[in-house]
C-alpha cells in the first residue's frame, strides 16, 4: 500500500528520523495557517503536490517559494491540477492535497532506499551519490555509482555497515553522526512498519552538516496491515485504481490490464497461465482475476460485475479447476450472474476437476449463450474467434 510523502514522513518522525517540518492542506482556505507555521522554520517554503507517483517536479508539481505570495500562488495552481509525470501515464493524477514544507540549505544530495531483494532473501540498502535523479536513470547511465549493502535479517543493520555506506558516499566527517542516526532510524521504520520499500530521494546534506530526508516514498506490505491499524487508516482510495478498489470490496484478487478478453480463474498460477494462453491465441487479457478457492455463486457474480465494468471487455473466458471449489457451484454462479448482470458479450467456460461433469451439464441445460470447451488452448482460440465475429 502506497502512502503520500507527508504520511511517510510522519512515520519516519515516529522513529526519530530527521525530516523537514511541514503541513498538508487540501484547500486554499487552509493555506494561511499552514504557511505561518512553516515559515517560522524557514523563510523559503517548498510547495509539493501529494500524489502516489514520482517525478512530480518534472511535471510542475513542486515549487520553491521565497515569498508568501509566491507560495500561495503555487498552492492555488497545484491544488486541483491534473499532474502528469513519467509515472502517472498520459492521463495524469488529480492533486487533492498539497504539502507546505520548510526549505533547506542544500550542500549535497544523495539517494537512499531500503527494500527486500527476493533473489537473495535479504534486505538491501541501496545508495548513490546521484541524489535527486530517478534511480533507474542512474542504473542505466552510471551503474558504478550505485552502492548495495546486504542486511542479514537475523542480526539487522550493523554499525560497520553504516560506516561503510558513509565512506562509499563520501559523507563529510562532520555529518557522519547525523548520517548514522538517520540511517538507523530509517532502517527501524522499514522493519517495524513492515514496509516493502522505503526510498529517500533526495537524502540531503545541509550546509549545517545535517543529514535530512528531503523526500520519502514508502510502500507498506498490505499483508501485514493487520498489525498496523494506524497505517491502514493512511490508505487513500482516490489514488488507487477504481477497479481494484471495487475488487477489494468483493474480496477478489484483481489487476486491470489493457486487453479486451476478461479472465475469471481460480488460483493465481492458473490465472497467469490463462493470460499467457490468451496472448498465445493472438489476443490480450483485460485483467488478472483470481476468485480464490472458495468460489461460490456470489463470488462469480461479483467477478462478472467487475469484469464487465471495464468497457474494453469484448468477451469473457472462465477457466476453473475444481479442487477445493466445486465446478457445479461455479456453473450455477455463472448462470445466475449471466442473468443478473445482463451479460451481452460471448462467454467461454472451461471446467475441470471436482464435479466438472455436473457443472458442464448444468451449463448445457441452462439455455444460456455460454460456450463450454474442453481444452485450454481450444478455449482460448474459441473466445478469440467469438470476439472477432
Swiss-Prot record:
GO MF assignments: ATP binding; magnesium ion binding; succinate-CoA ligase (ADP-forming) activity; succinate-CoA ligase (GDP-forming) activity
- Cofactor(s) needed for function: Mg(2+)
Binding sites annotated in the UniProt record for substrate: 266, 323-325
Q: Please share the entry's free-text remark on the cofactor.
A: Binds 1 Mg(2+) ion per subunit.
The EC number of this protein is: 6.2.1.5
Name its pathway.
Answer: Carbohydrate metabolism; tricarboxylic acid cycle; succinate from succinyl-CoA (ligase route): step 1/1
> What InterPro entries would the database entry show?
ATP-grasp_succ-CoA_synth-type (IPR013650), ATP_grasp_subdomain_1 (IPR013815), Succ-CoA_synthase_bsu_CS (IPR017866), SUCC_ACL_C (IPR005811), Succ_CoA_ligase-like_bsu (IPR005809), Succinyl-CoA_synth-like (IPR016102)
Pfam families listed in its UniProt record:
ATP-grasp_2 (PF08442), Ligase_CoA (PF00549)
Q: List the catalysed reactions.
A: succinate + ATP + CoA = succinyl-CoA + ADP + phosphate; GTP + succinate + CoA = succinyl-CoA + GDP + phosphate
Judged by the first EC level, this protein's enzyme class is ligase
One GO BP on record is: tricarboxylic acid cycle
Gene Ontology terms: cellular component: cytosol; succinate-CoA ligase complex
Listed binding positions for ATP are: 48, 55-57, 101, 104, 109
Which cysteine-cysteine pairs are annotated as disulfide bonds in the entry?
none
Task: Please provide the record's keywords in A-Z order.
Answer: ATP-binding, Ligase, Magnesium, Metal-binding, Nucleotide-binding, Tricarboxylic acid cycle
All residue ranges annotated as the ATP-grasp domain in the record:
9-246
Residues annotated as binding Mg(2+): 201, 215
Q: What does this protein do?
A: Succinyl-CoA synthetase functions in the citric acid cycle (TCA), coupling the hydrolysis of succinyl-CoA to the synthesis of either ATP or GTP and thus represents the only step of substrate-level phosphorylation in the TCA. The beta subunit provides nucleotide specificity of the enzyme and binds the substrate succinate, while the binding sites for coenzyme A and phosphate are found in the alpha subunit.
Protein family: Belongs to the succinate/malate CoA ligase beta subunit family.
Give the record's subunit note: Heterotetramer of two alpha and two beta subunits.
Name of the protein in its database record:
Succinate--CoA ligase [ADP-forming] subunit beta
Write the lineage as a comma-separated list: Bacteria, Pseudomonadati, Spirochaetota, Spirochaetia, Leptospirales
Gene name of this polypeptide? sucC
Amino acid at each position: 500500500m502506497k502512502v503520500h510523502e507527508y504520511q511517510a514522513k510522519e512515520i519516519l518522525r515516529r522513529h526519530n528520523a530527521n525530516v523537514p517540518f511541514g503541513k498538508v492542506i487540501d484547500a486554499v482556505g487552509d493555506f494561511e495557517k499552514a504557511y505561518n507555521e512553516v515559515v517560522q522554520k524557514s523563510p523559503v517554503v517548498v510547495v509539493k503536490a501529494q500524489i502516489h507517483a514520482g517525478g512530480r517536479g518534472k511535471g510542475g508539481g513542486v515549487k520553491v517559494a521565497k515569498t508568501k505570495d509566491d507560495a500561495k500562488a503555487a498552492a492555488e495552481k497545484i491544488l486541483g491540477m491534473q499532474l502528469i509525470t513519467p509515472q502517472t501515464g498520459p492521463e495524469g493524477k488529480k492533486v487533492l492535497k498539497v504539502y507546505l514544507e520548510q526549505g533547506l540549505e542544500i550542500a549535497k544530495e544523495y539517494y537512499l532506499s531500503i527494500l527486500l531483494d527476493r533473489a537473495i532473501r535479504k534486505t538491501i540498502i541501496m545508495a548513490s551519490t546521484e541524489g535527486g535523479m530517478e534511480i533507474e536513470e542512474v542504473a542505466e547511465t552510471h551503474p558504478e555509482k550505485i552502492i548495495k549493502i546486504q542486511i542479514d535479517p537475523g542480526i539487522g543493520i550493523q554499525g560497520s555497515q553504516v560506516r561503510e555506506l558513509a565512506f562509499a558516499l563520501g559523507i563529510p566527517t562532520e555529518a557522519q553522526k547525523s548520517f548514522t542516526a538517520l540511517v538507523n532510524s530509517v532502517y527501524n521504520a522499514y522493519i517495524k512498519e513492515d514496509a516493502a520499500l522505503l526510498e529517500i530521494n533526495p537524502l540531503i546534506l545541509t550546509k549545517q552538516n545535517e543529514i535530512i530526508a528531503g523526500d520519502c516514498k514508502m510502500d507498506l506490505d498490505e499483508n501485514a496491515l493487520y498489525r498496523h491499524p494506524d497505517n491502514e487508516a493512511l490508505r487513500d482510495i482516490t489514488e488507487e485504481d477504481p477497479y481494484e478498489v471495487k475488487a477489494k470490496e468483493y474480496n477478489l484478487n484483481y489487476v486491470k490490464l489493457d486487453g479486451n478478453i476478461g479472465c475469471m480463474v481460480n488460483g493465481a498460477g492458473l490465472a497467469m497461465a490463462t493470460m499467457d494462453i490468451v496472448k498465445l491465441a493472438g489476443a490480450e487479457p483485460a485483467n488478472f482475476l483470481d476468485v480464490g478457492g472458495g468460489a461460490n455463486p456470489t463470488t462469480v457474480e461479483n467477478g462478472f460485475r467487475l469484469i464487465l465494468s471495464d468497457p474494453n471487455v469484448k468477451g469473457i473466458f472462465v477457466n476453473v479447476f475444481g479442487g477445493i471449489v466445486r465446478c457445479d457451484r461455479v456453473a450455477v454462479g455463472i448462470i445466475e450472474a449471466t442473468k443478473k448482470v445482463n451479460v451481452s458479450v460471448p462467454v467461454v467456460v472451461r471446467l475441470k476437476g471436482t464435479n466438472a461433469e455436473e457443472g458442464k451439464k448444468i451449463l448445457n441445460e441452462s439455455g444460456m449463450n455460454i460456450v463450454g470447451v474442453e481444452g485450454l488452448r481450444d478455449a482460448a482460440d474459441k473466445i478469440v474467434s467469438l470476439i472477432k465475429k
